[in-house]
């Protein structure tokens, strides 16, 4: 029973969605093909940090031909300061890296001209703007290194930004020989996942400044939850505000900073830590998203890695802290500890009270990524100095825009220094049209999460009852990873009680759910492959969408380090599932069929 038509490999997910950030990976082999990247220059879609989207590729080709030397390639950025960071990163391995900065001057409704800006015009002091484009040019051999910067920092321009520039370029640039003007994609005609929403009233889109202001309010927990139509929107004046939902009384929109991607928020949190504290090693606590570890390793002195993220690892961490403090008591033993709540993909929750106690004792920063737990379900800010979130996931839900946020804990010991640095150095590079889209997508966040949490718990209870871990000895499912079953005592400590302030309803308290993400391991790769390829839902990377997604996570994220990942408990055949808003019974039937198919594959192997 198919929820949606199967989308062929390489096409956007969801279909009929401009600026889709996902790519269809319907089979095991397709996933391997995607990660090997040999078709990256011709594929039509992909996750924007790993894949240069079609509009961006077209604009980059135009810039290479117009401003590049023979044998040069380029990356495009919205800010001179970010472009300089890319130049420095690539220049560490290659010579001949340079930045060209452009300004588009719109002379009237039809005509524009491009002005090349000189370095002595104070570019580093100018705010990012859609009228500025910054090109990092480098030798072709340096392209893989430049792509790493694009991937790890999440600072590149978005497809909407590229479309804006393509629409305003003068004819002498657009008519460059050899550049195809076609960016069309043939979509399927099945039901769009965008239909899975809670039916918010159509309201006028806000201007970008209003959208960003309300996004920051929404993230800070200042706005009332949207549990009825007619709630506060960005375009309304005199917004009604409710109590902060983060457990920190003084956090406001002024303590929230927006970024173009979640990884950009993480990268900036690390740069912030390095700027205000002694540059010691960091700690990566738990098996977190792969690129978080890479950022900690590639910028600064490196990091200590504790893949299990359990109480034993906390004991081992404390040994290191004691040793480093004994060696030099004049400085903190580590710079900062980075962790996820819960972790991706094993959904383990660290013991935040113990970690916070160590942070207070040894004077290091705590940075918590709450993307999987999300604002509605968990309260982690009281334990953190900095909370980072990928807004591209459940906050948006529609898989058509990227975004990230960084929140400072006003009660943190280092808040004054952190806030002062951000006031002096924060640069808003979040493209206006992306912010407007994100604001619109996130208006019904609470209702969507409630539906998704209910669906995910029902699916996990069903699948776990058929797992070896739960006593089903002959099952093909080895284990289900979900916060309800993995380190539940740690998750429960931070599980949120949501106050309902809707005047049309009686006052009540609702407990946050366990989130919409879970992972499954199998007794063999044959079982994993059969289960994955027979799942009648979208099969694509990412998570937190309004529609159900599945992905072969380990193959996609750790293709070149499968043995190392397995040693950390992340098996090759792990299937990660992000649950959507579909009918619960329909989802149960879909997964029951996939389970039956996996059993048959093992029986006939």
Swiss-Prot record:
Cystathionine gamma-synthase-like enzyme; part of the gene cluster that mediates the biosynthesis of the psychoactive metabolites ibotenic acid and muscimol. The first committed step is glutamate hydroxylation by the 2-oxoglutarate-dependent dioxygenase iboH, and the last step is decarboxylation of ibotenic acid to muscimol by the decarboxylase iboD. The order of the intermediate reactions is somewhat ambiguous. IboA likely activates the carboxylic acid at position 5 to introduce an amide bond, and the flavin monooxygenase iboF generates the N-O bond. Its cofactor is pyridoxal 5'-phosphate. One of its GO terms (molecular function) is lyase activity. Its EC number is 4.4.-.-. The modification N6-(pyridoxal phosphate)lysine is found at residue 393. Belongs to the trans-sulfuration enzymes family. This is Cystathionine gamma-synthase-like enzyme iboG1. It is an enzyme of class 4 (lyase). One of its GO terms (biological process) is transsulfuration. Substrate binds at residue 289. It comes from Amanita muscaria (strain Koide BX008). SUPFAM superfamilies: PLP-dependent transferases (SSF53383). Keywords: Lyase, Pyridoxal phosphate. Induction: Expression is highly induced during artificial growth in symbiosis with Populus, which is close to its natural condition. Pathway: Secondary metabolite biosynthesis.
């Amino acid at each position: 029973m198919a929820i949606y038509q199967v989308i062929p490999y390489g096409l956007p997910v969801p279909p009929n969605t401009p600026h889709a950030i996902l790519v269809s990976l319907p089979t095991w082999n397709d996933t391997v093909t995607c990660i090997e990247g040999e078709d990256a220059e011709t594929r039509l879609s992909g996750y924007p940090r790993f894949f240069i989207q079609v509009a961006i590729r077209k604009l980059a080709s135009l810039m290479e031909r117009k401003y590049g030397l023979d044998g040069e390639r380029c990356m495009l950025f919205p800010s001179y300061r970010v472009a300089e960071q890319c130049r420095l990163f690539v220049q560490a391995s290659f010579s001949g890296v340079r930045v060209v900065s452009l300004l588009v001057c719109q002379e009237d409704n039809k005509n524009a001209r491009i002005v090349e800006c000189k370095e002595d015009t104070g570019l580093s002091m100018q705010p990012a703007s859609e009228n500025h484009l910054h090109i990092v040019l480098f030798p072709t051999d340096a392209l893989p290194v430049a792509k790493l910067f694009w991937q790890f920092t999440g600072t590149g321009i978005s497809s909407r930004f590229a479309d804006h520039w393509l629409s305003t370029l003068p004819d002498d640039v657009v008519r460059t020989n050899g550049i195809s003007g076609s960016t069309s994609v043939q979509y399927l005609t099945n039901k769009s996942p965008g239909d899975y929403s809670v039916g918010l009233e159509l309201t006028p889109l806000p201007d970008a400044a209003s959208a960003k202001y309300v996004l920051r309010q929404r993230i800070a927990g200042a706005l009332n939850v949207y549990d009825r139509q007619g709630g506060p929107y960005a375009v309304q004046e005199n917004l009604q505000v409710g109590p902060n939902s983060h457990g920190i009384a003084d956090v406001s929109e002024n303590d929230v900073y927006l970024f173009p991607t979640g990884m950009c928020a993480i990268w900036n949190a690390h740069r912030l830590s390095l700027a205000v504290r002694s540059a010691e090693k960091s700690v990566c606590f738990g098996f977190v998203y792969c690129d978080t570890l890479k950022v900690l390793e590639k910028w600064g002195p490196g990091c200590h890695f504790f893949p299990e993220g359990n109480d034993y690892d906390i004991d081992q961490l404390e040994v290191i802290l004691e040793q480093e403090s004994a060696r030099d008591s004049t400085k903190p033993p580590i710079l900062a500890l980075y962790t996820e709540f819960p972790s991706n993909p094993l959904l383990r929750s660290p013991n935040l009270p113990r970690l916070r106690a160590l942070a207070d004792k040894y004077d290091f920063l705590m940075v918590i990524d709450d993307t999987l737990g999300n604002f509605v379900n968990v309260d982690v800010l009281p334990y953190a100095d900095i909370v980072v979130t990928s807004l591209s996931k459940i906050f948006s839900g529609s898989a058509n825009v990227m975004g990230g946020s960084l929140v400072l804990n006003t009660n943190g010991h280092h808040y004054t220094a952190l806030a002062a640095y951000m006031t002096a150095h924060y640069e808003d590079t979040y493209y206006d049209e992306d912010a407007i889209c994100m604001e619109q997508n996130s208006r019904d966040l609470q209702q969507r999460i409630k539906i998704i949490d209910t669906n995910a718990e029902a699916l996990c209870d069903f699948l776990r009852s058929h797992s070896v871990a739960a006593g089903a000895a002959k099952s093909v499912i080895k284990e289900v990873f979900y916060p309800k079953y993995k380190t539940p005592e740690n998750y429960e400590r931070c599980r949120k009680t949501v106050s309902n302030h809707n005047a049309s309803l009686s006052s009540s308290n609702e407990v946050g759910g366990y989130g919409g993400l879970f992972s499954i391991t199998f007794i063999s790769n044959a079982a994993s492959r059969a289960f994955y390829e027979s799942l009648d839902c979208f099969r694509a990377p990412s998570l937190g969408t309004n529609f159900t997604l599945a992905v072969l996570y380990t193959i996609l994220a750790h293709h070149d380090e499968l043995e190392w990942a397995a040693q950390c408990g992340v098996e090759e055949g792990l299937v990660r599932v992000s649950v959507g808003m579909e009918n619960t019974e329909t989802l149960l039937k879909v997964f029951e069929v996939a389970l039956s198919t996996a059993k048959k594959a093992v029986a006939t192997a």
